[in-house]
Amino acid sequence: MLDNFIAHQTTKEFSVSEISNKIKELLENNFGYIKVKGEISGLKIANSGHAYFNLKENTAILACTCWRPILAKIKFPLNDGMEVVISGKLSSYAGNSRYQLSVDNLQPTGLGAMLQILNERKARLEKEGLFNKIRIPIPFLPDKIGVITSITGAVIKDIIHRIRERFPTRIIIWPVSVQGENSGNEIAEAIEGFNNLEEVNKPRVIIVARGGGSIEDLWSFNDEILVRAAYNSKIPIISAVGHEVDYTLIDLAADKRAPTPTAAAEFAVPVHSILNNTLQSYEKILLNNTSRLIKYHEQNIVNYNKIHRYLSHYINHRQQLLDETGFNLLDALPCFIELQETKIKSFSKERVNPAKIINYKTLELTHQTAYLSKSANNTLKNFEYKLELNSTLLASLDYHNVLKRGFAIVKGETGNFLSSKITAANEKIFNIKFSDGEIKVVRA
């Protein structure tokens, strides 16, 4: 009893604030930065943009607070029941005497939740067109190959070995972590880093590689920032993540997808021996074609020589004919000149005799006068015949002559002509004109 009293008297006294701060210091100093795995429950997002929820496992519960700047960095929606791994610092909240985890990073861990997030992200990025870019062809025989992967492990060794085995070339390694919270950012920065190098140091193709693993292990390669870096890369990218059955979002944004890291090395460079054999085959084909081409042109030269000899003979023959023609012309020219001089002299004599010219013109005038007289007589007879014909036709059309042939003209009382039964039906008085006179008839 006395001991209890003494202990009570010697126990240190704290205020509520002091004990709350003391507990806060103990939590923050002893636990520091931790990771906790559990299931989200009781999720609430305040108007301030901060998220409050519990992380539970069976009956145990850990209160969590995700501040707005951290929540904005999370690229998938939070839901109750989602399994996650949270990184952060333990602290206590004096307002209700509880401890809580201040979230610094949050990653999904349950397969169902991760697949849901993956499908939602894939649909959104596909809608943006990040998976439909124009693929850059992988260059043939690149002089520099960039490799982004972990510096440790079998992957980098397999890639280096395969490239050196097939076609040795310069390899530039950009070491990154291929798993973990910041892995996606590191790989994206490596892609951007290669693209920003000076042209002389820039690789011609980039291999992004990692060995196989679970969906959690490969999750960094589904990171949105990494997909955008692959899409924006001006250097062609070969993605080689996991095994052949493993697919990540970087595979859809890369210029070529390799089923394994070793296959990526094979896509990057050809086999030296096969290439050498191919070159030798091409060399043989080139030599054979060159030989045939030379023989073909040699035969053409022979044919051209034959044609040249024939043309020379033909030209010489034609030249001989031309010479003979020239000689004949020279011989005939004096005779031709003499003949033309004779014609000129004869023409001159005819021109100086006016009597002959007058007689010729008189005879020509006589012929023309006779032709004109005959033509005028023929034209006059033709006009007289047409006049007589038209007079006869005109006389036959005179209605007096028609009346003489027994016809009559019937008029109504008002003098209107009645040319049919219908027009005469309503008339009572008719005037009928004959060739020798006119009578009036009244209808009874």
From Swiss-Prot:
Q: Which UniProt keywords apply?
A: Cytoplasm, Exonuclease, Hydrolase, Nuclease
Organism, scientific name: Rickettsia africae (strain ESF-5)
Any GO MF annotation of the entry: nucleic acid binding
Q: Name one GO biological process term.
A: DNA catabolic process
Q: What is this protein's function?
A: Bidirectionally degrades single-stranded DNA into large acid-insoluble oligonucleotides, which are then degraded further into small acid-soluble oligonucleotides.
Q: Which reaction does it catalyse?
A: Exonucleolytic cleavage in either 5'- to 3'- or 3'- to 5'-direction to yield nucleoside 5'-phosphates
- List the NCBIfam families hit by this protein, alphabetically: xseA
Q: List the EC numbers from the record.
A: 3.1.11.6
> What family, per the record?
Belongs to the XseA family.
Q: How does it assemble?
A: Heterooligomer composed of large and small subunits.
Gene field:
xseA
Q: What is this protein called?
A: Exodeoxyribonuclease 7 large subunit
Q: Where in the cell is it found?
A: Cytoplasm
- A Pfam family matched by this chain, by name? tRNA_anti_2
- What InterPro entries would the database entry show? Exonuc_VII_L, Exonuc_VII_lsu_C, OB-fold_nuc-bd_dom
Any one of the GO CC terms = exodeoxyribonuclease VII complex
Primary localization: cytoplasm
Q: What class of enzyme is it?
A: hydrolase
Asked if the record carries the keyword Glycoprotein, the reply is no
